[in-house]
Every structure is written in C-alpha cells, then in structure tokens.
Amino acid sequence: MNAVMTDVRDLIRYCDDVLDAARFADYAPNGLQVEGERPLQRLVSGVTASAALIEAAIAEHADAILVHHGWFWKNENPCLIGIKGQRARTLLSAGVSLIAYHLPLDAHPELGNNATLGRRLDFIDMEPTALANGLLWVGRLAQPMTPASFTEHVSQRLARPALRVGRETGSIERVAWCTGGCQGYIEQAASLGVDAFLSGELSEQTTHQARELGLCYLAAGHHATERYGVQALGKHLAERFGLWHRFVEIDNPA
C-alpha cells in the first residue's frame, strides 16, 4: 500500500473527536505532545514512549509515534533532563511527532483498552459501568471456570503469567476489569457482585482486600493489559487516513 501524506494536526483533530478527549481531566496532555517536522505517512504505535520505542520507530522511518503512556505527567519534573532529555533529543533530531492518548484510550467503547482487552479474553456481555468514571467494565465468561483455570486462560491469552490472590475455590463467571494500575478499584468492583476482578498491578493491600471481599483478583500486567487499545487505534487511523502502520512491542514484565 502506498501511504497517503496526512497533516498530523488533521489526525489529532480526528482522534480528539473520536475519543472525546476533551471530556477527560487527565494526568498528562492528550493529543500532539511533540510536533515533528514533516507530514505523516508512516505511523508506529506502542504502549509507552520509551527510548527503545523511539529508536524502533526511527528504524521504521516513522513520521509519528502513537502511544498510551506519553510524556509531561502531572507532578513530574517538567524539565527535559536526564533520560527524558535524551529521549526528547532523539525524537526531535529525527523530526518525529509524538502523539499520546491516556484516559480517552482507556475508555473508548470500541477502540479502548478495556474494550479490546475484554475481546482478547473472550468475555461476553461486556459493558462499562458508571463506576470509576466509566473505566470499570463488567462482563461474563462464556463458560464458568475455576480460579485456577481462569488464571491460566488469562495468562495464555496475554502471553504473560497472571498473578492471582484472594479467592481460590468456587466458580468464576461474572468478571470486572480495568486495565493498567487500577487495583485501587477492587472494592468498587466487588460492589458489582462479580466473582473476579482483573487489572494490571498488585499492591500490598490488594491481597488482603481480595481475601476479605471473597474476590478472585488477577494482576495481569500493566503493560500487558494496555497493549491492545493503541494497536486498535493505530490500525483504525491507518485505514481512515491511508497510512502505513506498525505496532512495536517493547517487552515489559510490569
């Protein structure tokens, strides 16, 4: 396919509209974080705007990088020094744009991290709830599983071992989930009457909460649970604008 040249700002306006980005009070700016020096024909997507992803994008002759975890987070030192300075120098010297969408990409009902993870894990009857600003989703397994078999299913589908705490017996059918670092929503998930709650990370207190709530909790990886939304958005943009697109996986066990 011959890629079509696109003004990056046209693409940003489209993304802002599709993802309803203005609705979210986020922890970092959504949209165009660093403006490159040329029109967009080749797009690389990835989870996090790390040095490894930037270098991989440059090797692919990308004009822009699309990520879920970008730069300029609130309460973070804004100065471009140390590794942040090195990342910025590498990106700017290559003339590559950086595009990031955080909460809007978590929440989108088709392209978002929660929606795409649910499909990846073969959940059915999926829908967002009113809890956690709509970021907490609920659904069912097509067939009930034991906690052990559910853990194995998730591990296989995500190609990463999931860590289980809390409930060890009984049947898992109704599931709540929220990608990334959302273990703090465990009590809200339990209030939905689900058998299991899945997110990316595990905190010290999560183990005790899961046990006391009688809930099966799976920590399936922050990175692993947030790989699929940015892939879906990148693919959608490639089809919409006639771009060349490739998702680059930078392994992260966290």
UniProtKB/Swiss-Prot annotation:
Give the organism the record lists: Allochromatium vinosum (strain ATCC 17899 / DSM 180 / NBRC 103801 / NCIMB 10441 / D)
Which domain of life does this protein belong to?
Answer: Bacteria
Its Gene Ontology cellular component terms are: cytoplasm
Q: Which UniProt keywords apply?
A: Metal-binding
State where a divalent metal cation 1 binds. Answer: H68, D106, E226
- UniProt key word Acetylation: no
Please provide, alphabetically and separated by semicolons, the GO molecular function terms listed in this UniProt record: metal ion binding
- Locate the coiled-coil region(s) and give their ranges: none
Keyword Repeat listed: no
Which protein family is it in? Answer: Belongs to the GTP cyclohydrolase I type 2/NIF3 family.
Complexes and interactors:
Homohexamer.
Q: Which residues take part in binding a divalent metal cation 2?
A: H69, H222, E226
Q: List the disulfide bonds.
A: none
- Output the NCBIfam families linked to this UniProt entry: YbgI_SA1388
Task: Return the protein name.
Answer: GTP cyclohydrolase 1 type 2 homolog
